[in-house]
Amino acid sequence: MNVSVSPASSLIIKGESNVNKFQCSYDVLQFSDSIEVSFISDKAYLNFTNTQLHLKNSFFDCGHKAINRDFNKLLKTDEFPSIKIELISAHNQPNNLSIMTKLNIVISGISKRYDIPVEVDKTTDGVMICGNLPIDINDFNLSPPKKLLGMIKVSNKIEIDFNLAVKTSE
């Protein structure tokens, strides 16, 4: 099965410094290719095979040229041009209000596994998948930037906030 991510989606990386907050929005119009989804159903679990979303670092916009440059430097974009998110498995939560997913995320060549609850709501032409994933960038051997001789420090804690409008495509 193939799915496509519609322009009604949003994917935002949020962070803050000791001075202010920032967010880097992904240009969802770049989701032009369909994504192959392959899974095996095992009772209440779906186990996925090679179901990946590649986010090109250069398609994030942090609202200011200097912040974009710092963002790409932090992620080592010259060496690792994209973030890879791989869906490993999914199963219903006991409360039936959310689905617990297991994701493998690769940032700057470092891979980490996360369990994240997501909400899935049916829409007229597909589903809306929503979630929020807090990440410590130190887990990926990344050092948050410092500015003005260290007076401005960016927190190592970020959040990936996503609302993906997904529909099956032939």
Where are each of the predicted segments found?
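Low-complexity, acidic/polar, glycine-enriched regions of mature
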Residues: M1-E170
